[in-house]
Amino acid sequence: MPPTATAEPVTASTHMLSNETDYHALNAMLNLYDADGKIQFDKDVLAARQFFLQHVNQNTVFFHNQDEKLDYLIRENYYEREVLDQYSRNFVKSLLDRAYAKKFRFSTFLGAFKYYTSYTLKTFDGKRYLERLEDRVCMVALTLAAGDTGLAEKLVDEIIDGRFQPATPTFLNSGKKQRGEPVSCFLLRIEDNMESIGRSVNSALQLSKRGGGVALLLSNIREHGAPIKNIEHQSSGVIPIMKLLEDAFSYANQLGARQGAGAVYLHAHHPDIYRFLDTKRENADEKIRIKTLSLGVIIPDITFELAKRNEDMYLFSSYDVERVYEVPFADISVTEKYYEMLDDARIRKTKIKAREFFQKLAELQFESGYPYVMFEDTVNRANPIEGKITHSNLCSEILQVSTPSLFNDDLSYAKVGKDISCNLGSLNIAKTMDSPDFAQTVEVAIRALTAVSDQTHIKSVPSIEQGNNDSHAIGLGQMNLHGYLSREGIFYGSEEGVDFTNIYFYTVLFHVLLASNSIAIERGTFFKGFERSKYASGEFFDKYIEQTWEPKTDKVRQLFAEAAIRIPTQNDWKRLKELVVAHGIYNQNLQAVPPTGSISYINHSTSSIHPIVSKVEIRKEGKIGRVYYPAPYMTNDNLQYYQDAYEIGYQKIIDTYAAATQHVDQGLSLTLFFKDTATTRDVNKAQIYAWRKGIKTLYYIRLRQMALEGTEVEGCVSCTL
């Protein structure tokens, strides 16, 4: 295997330097060339080492042995006794020995810093550390394995070897007595009645209190000026509900730790769409301005078709549509019913220009990075599950079917619908390609995420509980694509890069379905509604059985051969189809590619499957200030492969995501990056290109001069290489 980015030699002179230089100063040297004009990767290795010597070791509580430590952590209510009671003490100690025998070392200073500031168990006063990474990994494994010793051992191997990384809420909370939920992303529908609105605000409070980010659907709310009790011009539209939600998230701020996070989605053909977008304008009136809620817009195919022909675009009264069709506005296919609704005199309409709509969208994205975009028809064509997908989540990668709830006057449930929770974790593509057993790595990840679903019980929001219990939905993500491609001498977005992405996701999909089918066979059950899905009919498998999927380039064929990873054949898919049709799959949804933030640094990965934003990334980390992070596997000899996202451009990013999208049942967080010379026309071109390529959702729009959240993207030395 090629050397990692941290394999640069540490010389005697750097050892002398380390005795008198603190870890923060050493890390900062990443942003300075050495005398030969090289990036000083060795200084970051030293910084990580010094972080332990100067800080971690001095602030870690000492125990004489494992028994003393475990007894203390249980007795003092740090660890959940119920988790450990599922195993013998000897097994728990053997698992810890297994983890420590791996001799794990953080590859970067930022990875170590992130772990100790954000994840590890600390004393109740927050001043001292009670765990090392090995302890955290074992507690995650013991929690998720729920008494299965074999699975616990496999989980320790997969996590500590860096192949599988649970998402933040799972990695942070598992096994702790004082903890949040292991899942932290939720989607709710709001229906067009006061009971649903009130209950949704309460649900947002409950979920935010538990550390959750919540996305809510506003498309069904009657528009501004619609009738209430047959009296015209009474409705206030969606803006006051957005204000209520913004205040709710601000109030439920997780014990003051951080602001609650919320997003709202509205359909492009809802009459309030311009009002909705105007809430994010910098010069918006304070009465309507929305500062902290994220915005998403749902755009159907018809909107693009109208813009292509430079035609008018009609917005339809959501109030009238629900009365004519007897289903909520969001459950109607606007593309399918557009001309029918246009001709229906019972439905009020507002006329705008389709191209003007896209222009306003691009202007706002330039100004604020919002809104997210969901391509409604693309999403629903690819959906193998019965029902309609109406909106996405805070990171635009969760795409699941939801159903409305009905409420009594006292806000109790007359009928509990299905809302959505996201159980996430990601594979490190580079480490997974290096796995001694690719199929096992994928299966263990699926079993871990299924355990998160099985162990999550959000009883305060019955529709979330119902959705989780019925669907067992999970979202296996991926990260470190750019890092892996660069390590192997492939440019991101090149023919070989896109070819690898296609075959990798194709192969993962096969093993994901096989794992979920195995769980269904073991448990003798499958997700609710399986029999009405494209999995049960076999239709889902047609594209894999009717054509051959194999590498188009010699390089990618060679990578899979050297890794001894067998690429599934048409016959493999035929056998899998027979198994699934006969026995089902346990999980309604299986894959979703989130943006991956902090866990990427701990795992030393490039974020998600998008390109790096900088060769050496600058982050602002609380009181410590600027911290520098080198791209994985980068050395002074392979810098040419580390073009940043702004240099690569939107087409290659979209091509890469399109290759992955065709094998992912949910979505992928796709941020578009533009140089500061870009215009709104460039943004519109990118949106059209994404739509044509079958992309499902778009996340943020980033201009080079805009800072990524929590970072500074500026002209640092390493960016100019």
From Swiss-Prot:
Enzyme category, top tier: oxidoreductase
Residues marked Allosteric effector binding (site)? 192, 222
| Family as reported in the entry's similarity comment | Belongs to the ribonucleoside diphosphate reductase large chain family.
Q: List the disulfide bonds.
A: 185-422
Q: Where is this site: Interacts with thioredoxin/glutaredoxin?
A: 716, 719
Where exactly is the site Important for hydrogen atom transfer?
185, 422
**What GO terms are given for molecular function?**
ATP binding; ribonucleoside-diphosphate reductase activity, thioredoxin disulfide as acceptor
Q: Which SUPFAM superfamilies match?
A: PFL-like glycyl radical enzymes, R1 subunit of ribonucleotide reductase, N-terminal domain
Tell me the subunit arrangement: Tetramer of two alpha and two beta subunits.
PROSITE patterns, from UniProt?
Answer: RIBORED_LARGE
Known regulation of activity:
Under complex allosteric control mediated by deoxynucleoside triphosphates and ATP binding. The type of nucleotide bound at the specificity site determines substrate preference. It seems probable that ATP makes the enzyme reduce CDP and UDP, dGTP favors ADP reduction and dTTP favors GDP reduction.
Which EC numbers characterise this protein's activity in its record?
A: 1.17.4.1
Q: Indicate what this protein is called per its UniProt record.
A: Ribonucleoside-diphosphate reductase subunit alpha
The reaction(s) annotated as catalysed by this protein in its Swiss-Prot or TrEMBL entry are:
a 2'-deoxyribonucleoside 5'-diphosphate + [thioredoxin]-disulfide + H2O = a ribonucleoside 5'-diphosphate + [thioredoxin]-dithiol
Q: Which residues does the Swiss-Prot or TrEMBL record annotate as the active site?
A: 393, 395, 397
User: In the UniProt record, does the keyword Flavoprotein occur?
Assistant: no
Gene from which this protein is expressed: nrdE
Q: Where is this site: Important for electron transfer?
A: 699-700
